[in-house]
């Protein structure tokens, strides 16, 4: 365990450098929005790299993009549910002290959170941090896969729709 701690500063620095490299690579992709870095942050630390897509501009929803990225060998996740739909924040389901003590402040089912819903249900794409441990090759491969998927977005969307129709019966 101690050896891992000793390696951490160099690994964190590499992830930070590769995240900046990924930001640059994705800034060229239509319909992709990278997270803006707050200038007050001195270090960028993460276990997942998160970016957003505009489904209309990119050509598909985030779940289809993540499925296609998985097929390309890029570990991907659509992220968490929006807060008002997330079980952890439902006082009737939570064992946490604060939601149980103040359930009136945690009545998320009756809240309208359109930005959170849009981000979580349509836009967010989370990449595994292992991509960044592979150096520029890992980032280049992931960025190339994202660009390839976008070039084929119409065909992939049509295939996905055919599958939805087939299995909704």
Model-derived regions, located:
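PLP-dependent aminotransferase class I/II
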Residues: 1-169
């Amino acid at each position: 365990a101690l050896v891992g701690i000793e390696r951490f500063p160099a690994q964190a620095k590499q992830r930070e450098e590769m995240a900046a490299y990924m930001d640059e690579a994705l800034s060229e992709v239509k319909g992709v929005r990278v997270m803006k870095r707050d200038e007050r942050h001195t270090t960028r630390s993460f276990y997942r790299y998160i970016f957003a897509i505009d489904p209309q501009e990119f050509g598909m929803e985030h779940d289809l993009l993540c499925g296609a990225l998985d097929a390309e060998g890029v570990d991907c996740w659509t992220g968490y549910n929006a807060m008002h739909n997330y079980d952890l924040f439902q006082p009737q389901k939570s064992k946490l002290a604060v939601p149980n003590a103040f359930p009136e402040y945690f009545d998320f089912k009756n809240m309208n959170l359109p930005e959170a819903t849009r981000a979580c249900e349509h836009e967010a794409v989370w990449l595994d941090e292992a991509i960044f441990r592979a150096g520029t090759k890992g980032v280049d491969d992931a960025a190339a896969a994202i660009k390839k998927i976008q070039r084929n977005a119409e065909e992939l969307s049509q295939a996905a729709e055919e599958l939805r129709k087939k299995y909704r019966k």
